[in-house]
Amino acid sequence: ELAKLHAKPSALLFSSAYVANEWTLIALSKIIPNIVFLSDSKNHASLIQGILHSNAPKMIWTHNDMSDLEEKLKKAASLNLVPCIVFESVYSMDGDVSPILSVCDLADKYGAMTYIDEVHAVGLYGTTGAGYLEMLGIQDRVDIVNGTLGKAFGVQGGYIAGDGMVIDAIRSVASGFIFTTSMSPVICSGALASIKYLKDHPELREQQQLQVKKLKHKLNKVGVEVHPSACTHIVPVMVRNAERAKRMSDELLNEYGIYIQAINHPTVAHGEERLRIAPTPFHTDAMISDLVEALEKVFKNVD
């Protein structure tokens, strides 16, 4: 079902998307001689750890900077290394999106492999909920897709999808897949039901995007700063002070019954602290109005 969702020949389940990322990258370093990982500077910790633990050479390219990525690809070619571009579709802290088409064009130009993390996109984008690649109509242009069953699908676990031979090779050498307990039939059944349900209910994705637009509009109207790069369902409200962000989060919960997680260093840089909001299709207009009103008061009351 996951392979079908991503229009790939094969898929492989892991205990989490973190484990899937980490051990797939480690496995690729064992399978492909002379591989070099070209990693976006804002990649998730699981991707970073996978690259570090692989002991393969790496090059870090400036976030979403295609000129820098191309320079790294040229360098990899000059060293006779096999490049694997590692990036995400939706970045969870800023709520921005990678220039996926441009990345794929560069990959084609330099013969690079592509590995994309769609954790914050699966279930939420695309005709059937397969993510940003499906929404752009380019599922065939990325080699390996990583996704999660624990966010939009609301269950547990992670996976990769890709070419059958590549997935079989990863299955054979990824210790994080081989030497751990498999997902239980109950969890698999729940995930399968959720995947099928979201495939058949695109109106939920449409409703979520509508509620996100309403929230951003209302926040802008009252002068609450949203990260300027945010263009997805992730709405980062900028606070820029760790202690204040924590106090604001506490007051929202204690005084208004609204839980919003404060995001501090090392997840984001010092001075970039924020409250991260992700509206769902089931957050009503009244709930959004209450949230904005509460945020406006908390920004005034909490120093």
Task: Tell me the role of every PLM-derived stretch.
Residues 2-23:
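Short loop-beta-helix segment that forms the pyridoxal 5′-phosphate
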Residues 4, 254-255, 267-303:
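PLP-dependent enzyme catalytic core of the Aspartate aminotransferase-like
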Residues 16, 38-54:
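Substrate-binding/gating loop at the entrance of the active-site cleft, primarily
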Residues 24-45:
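Conserved PLP-anchoring active-site segment centered on the Schiff-base-forming lysine
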Residues 59, 63-116:
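Active-site phosphate-binding strand-loop segment of PLP-dependent enzymes
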Residues 110-113, 120, 125-231:
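Active-site C-terminal subdomain of aminotransferase-like
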Residues 205-216, 220-257, 265, 271-272, ...:
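Conserved PLP-binding catalytic core of the aspartate aminotransferase-like
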